[in-house]
Amino acid sequence: MIAAVHGPAIGGGLGLALAADFRVTCAEARFSANFNRLGIHPGFGLSYMLPRLVGQQQASLLFYTGRRIAGEEAVRIGLADQLVPQPEVRSKAIELAEEIAASSPVAVQSTRSTLRAGLVEQFRLAVARESIEQNIHFETEDFQEGVRAMSERRMPRFKGY
């Protein structure tokens, strides 16, 4: 699966993009794991997928700060695979799919299975943990403040509970 990211991939949208095998993007795209800015634990399997792609240090930085990064930085840190002009994102993603399709389907499928061995189980464990943590966070004042602050387009004033 190939994701063509030409706009925002934020929160759950980032999780969807990371579920793909490859990501084609542009300078105008924005990526953010902004959960902590909302006062909540990351979800959508991001606590497993993001460190797997960019490393523990970069993932921690993106989670803790909620920082938005552009397409260039996403490619630089390994979050995306190709940087192309915005009007070409979709066509370049299709070109990549066609390039992969020129290989043996049996070989591609078995290689993908080998590369992803154990991924499903680890992903399920991460999602289960995320769900437990999020259910706790939904009840906090910090989560309510984070959502309120985002809707009011202001910095949140978290209390730590």
Where are these regions (language model features)?
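Acidic, divalent-metal-coordinating active-site segment for phosphoryl/phosphodiester hydrolysis
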Residues: 67-73
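Short alpha-helical scaffolding segments that buttress acidic/His motifs in well-ordered protein cores
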Residues: 62-63, 111-114, 150
